[in-house]
Amino acid sequence: MSFVIAAPEVIAAAATDLASLGSSISAANAAAAANTTALIAAGADEVSTAIAALFGAHGQAYQALSAQAQAFHAQFVQALTSGGGAYAAAEAAAVSPLLDPINEFFLANTGRPLIGNGANGAPGTGANGGDGGWLIGNGGAGGSGAAGVNGGAGGNGGAGGLIGNGGAGGAGGVASSGIGGSGGAGGNAMLFGAGGAGGAGGGVVALTGGAGGAGGAGGNAGLLFGAAGVGGAGGFTNGSALGGAGGAGGAGGLFATGGVGGSGGAGSSGGAGGAGGAGGLFGAGGTGGHGGFADSSFGGVGGAGGAGGLFGAGGEGGSGGHSLVAGGDGGAGGNAGMLALGAAGGAGGIGGDGGTLTAGGIGGAGGAGGNAGLLFGSGGSGGAGGFGFADGGQGGPGGNAGTVFGSGGAGGNGGVGQGFAGGIGGAGGTPGLIGNGGNGGNGGASAVTGGNGGIGGTGVLIGNGGNGGSGGIGAGKAGVGGVSGLLLGLDGFNAPASTSPLHTLQQNVLNVVNEPFQTLTGRPLIGNGANGTPGTGADGGAGGWLFGNGANGTPGTGAAGGAGGWLFGNGGNGGHGATNTAATATGGAGGAGGILFGTGGNGGTGGIATGAGGIGGAGGAGGVSLLIGSGGTGGNGGNSIGVAGIGGAGGRGGDAGLLFGAAGTGGHGAAGGVPAGVGGAGGNGGLFANGGAGGAGGFNAAGGNGGNGGLFGTGGTGGAGTNFGAGGNGGNGGLFGAGGTGGAAGSGGSGITTGGGGHGGNAGLLSLGASGGAGGSGGASSLAGGAGGTGGNGALLFGFGGAGGAGGHGGAALTSIQQGGAGGAGGNGGLLFGSAGAGGAGGSGANALGAGTGGTGGDGGHAGVFGNGGDGGCRRVWRRYRRQRWCRRQRRADRQRRQRRQRRQSRGHARCRRHRRAAARRERTQRLAIAGRPATTRGVEGISCSPQMMP
C-alpha cells in the first residue's frame, strides 16, 4: 500500500458518475418491465399462450437479475464513496502530525501559523478574524456584531498570507432603536490574493429614529495579483431612520483595479455610496457605490470614483439613489493617474430619479467627470441629471484634459422635468494645449420650461471650442459655445462673436477651407459638427476629418449624436426621446469618438410615456471609441407616468477604445411605471481596458450586467438593483483579466421580499493570478433578506476564486418570522495554483418581537493543487469550529496513546536485554566449572549471587 496513489476528488467524481449511471439504468428497466414481464398471447390457442408465458418468464428473470445488479451497484458506489473519504482522511492525518509542530512554533513566536487558514470570529461577538498563515492561508472572516439598542460593530477580516485571500469583514449588529453597528473592514491580501469584502452595516428595527450602520471598507488586493475587496453595503432602516453609508472599496495591487464602493442603505434618507478604491500602479480606480433609496427625503449621494494609479484611468462615479422626494446626486468621477498615457478621467455618476406623480419631486444632479493625467488624456464625461416629476436634475460638468494633449469631457445632459423645469446641461471640460473643448450637455425637456444647454469648453492652442448644448423642449435656450484655440481651430456651435480681427480672419479662412469638404463629404476638414435644429429631428453633424467634436442630436426626437472627428474628437450626445401618449420613443445613441483619440458621446434619455399603458423609451446606447478613448454612458430609460405604464430600460454603455480607455456605464432604468426599467449593460473594454459598470435599475428593477473586460482587462461591476431589484452580474474578465464584481441588490425597506446579489464574473482563462469577481450582497428586507451572489471562478490554471456575497439582513416586520438571506458560494481557484473564495456570510435576522434566524453561510470554493479551500460563511462557522476543536482533542489523545505504547515497548526491550545477559553469564559459569576453573560471582539484575544459586 505504500505505493498506492489516490486522488479523493477523482474518486468522488467517479462515484457521482456511477450513481447517475445506475439511476439511468434503473429508469430504463422500470420502463421496460410492463412490456416484457406480462406479455399478452397473440392468439387463443395453447401454443401462443405458451410462447407468451415463456417470454414473460424470461422478462421476469431479467428483472430479478436487474434488481440484484442494482443492489450490487449501490453497494459498489457506497464502497467507492467511503473509500474516497478514507483516503482523504488518511491524507489529512498524515499531514497534520508533520505540520502541527511547525505551526506551533510560528504561533508561539508570531501569533499566526506558517500554513493554514485563520479562524473565523464567532457570530454575535464582533471578534476579528484570525490572520492566515505566513506562507499559505486565507484570513478568517470577522464575527458579526451583537444585536442591542445600538448594534455592535462587526469584526475585521484577517489578513491573508503570501498566498491567500483576506477575510471578509463581519456584518454590523442590528439595533432595536439606536444606531446599527458598523461593518468590519475586509482583510488585506499580501502578495497573491484578493482583499476581503467589507461587512454590511447593521439595520435598525424601530420605525422611528436611529440610523443604519456604515459598511466596512474593502481589503487591499495582493501586491502582485488579486482583486481589491468590495466595500460593505450600508445598513437599511425602516420609517424615519437614516440609511447607513456604504464602505469604501479597497486599494488595488500592482495591476489591479480598485475595489467597488458599497451601496448606501435604504431609509427615510438614503445613505451615501462608498468611494471607489484607488487603483494600483497600472490599475484603474474603482467604481463608486450606488446611493441608497429614500422613501421620504433625499436619495443617497453616489460614491466618488477612485483615483487611478500612476498609469491608470479614473474610476466611474456611483449613481445617485432614487427617492420619492428628491433623487441623490451622482458621484464625481475619479482622476486618472499623473503619468497615465491616454487614460481618461472617470465618468460622473448619473443623478437619481425623484418624486411621485402626485407630489412632484426633484431629480438628482449628475456627477462631475474626472480629470485626465498630468500630460495626456481626455477628461471624463459628466453624468446625466436624474428625472424629476417636478424639476429635472442638472447635468454634471465634463472633466479637464491633460495639459499637453487631450479633449475636455462632454457635459452631461440635463434631466427631464415632467411638471415644471428641465435640468440644465453640464458644461464641457477644458482641453489640453492640443485638443477640443468638451461639448455642453443638452438641456432637459419639460412640459413647462425646458432646461438650458450647457456651455462648451474653450480651446487652448490647437483645437476647436466645444459646442454649446441644445436647449430642452419647452423653450430651453442653447448653451454658449466655446472659443477655438489660439493657433488653429473653429469656434463651437453658438459661440459668441469675436471682437479680435485676427481671430475673425482665422475663422473665415477655415470656413473657406472646409467648404469643399463639407459639400463633398458632409463633414468639414477641421471643426465641430452642427447641432440638429430643434423641430427637425436631425442627427448631430459629424466632426471634422482631422479633428472636431460630433454635434449633439436634436432633443425630443431621439436623434443620434454625431461622430467625432475622423482622427481626433469626441462623439456628440444623443438627443432624448419624444414625449408621447402610448408608443415608445427611444433616446438617441451617442456618437462614436475619433479613430485615434476621442470619447464616445452619451446616449440620450428615452422618451416619456404619458398615456395609460404607455411604455417609456429605452435609453440610447453610448458611443464607442475606436483606438484610444472612453465609451459613452448609456442613456437613462424613459419614464411612464400613466396608469399601468412600463418604465424604459437603460441604454448600453459604449465600448472602450481598442488600446486605452474606459468602457461606458450603462444607463439607469426608468423609475416610473410597474414594472420599472432594468439598468443598461456596461460596455466592453478594449485591449487593456476594463468593462463598464452596469446601470442601476429603476424602482424595484434589476441592475444591468457589467461589461466584459478586454484582453487584459477586468470585467465591469454589475449595476445595483433598486429597492427590491436584483443586482446585475459582474462582467467576465478578458483572456488575461480578472472577473467583475456582482452588483448589490436593492434593500426592501418596509417591503416583504428583496432581490439577490449579482454573481461575480469569471476571470480570464489564461490570466496569471487573477481573481474571480466577488458576488454582490443580497438586499435587506423586512422579512427575508436576499441571497448573496456567488463568487466568480479564478483563472483556469493560476487564479483565486471570488468571495461569495453576504446575505441580506432580515428586517423588522410585525411578525416573528425573520430570515436572513443565504450567503453566496465562493468561487473556485485555479486548477494548479490559487486559493478558493470564501463563502458569503448569512444575513442576520432581526425582529421587534424576538430574535430572527440568521441566514445560511455560503460554501467555500475549491482550491487548486497549491492553495487553500475557501472558508464557509458565518452560519456554518460555529459548527465547523466545534468540529475542528474535537479533531484537535482526538489527535492529542492519539498522540498520548502512541507515546504510552512506545514506553511500554521500550521497557519490554530492556527486560529482554537483561535476561540475555543473565543467560550468557550462566553459560560462561558452566563452561568454567567443566574446565575446573573457579567461577566468578556476579550480581544478576541487582542481586548478588553465586553460580550455584543460578536456576
Swiss-Prot record:
Entry-linked InterPro entries: PE-PGRS_N (IPR000084)
Domain PE: 4-94
Subcellular localization(s) per the UniProt record: Cell outer membrane; Secreted; Secreted, Cell wall; Cell surface
Entry's Gene Ontology cellular component terms: cell outer membrane; cell surface; extracellular region
Keyword Secreted: yes
Gene3D superfamilies: HP0062-like domain
Superkingdom assignment: Bacteria
Basic residues compositional bias, start-end: 887-919
Keywords: Cell outer membrane, Cell wall, Membrane, Repeat, Secreted, Virulence
Region (Disordered): 887-951
Entry's family note: Belongs to the mycobacterial PE family. PGRS subfamily.
Function: The arginine-rich C-terminal region protrudes from the mycobacterial membrane and mediates M.tuberculosis entry into host epithelial cells. May serve as a bridge between mycobacteria and host cells by interacting with specific host phospholipids and extracting them from host cells, for their direct integration or as a source of phosphate, during phases of TB pathogenesis when M.tuberculosis is short of phosphate supply.
Protein name, as recorded: PE-PGRS family protein PE_PGRS3
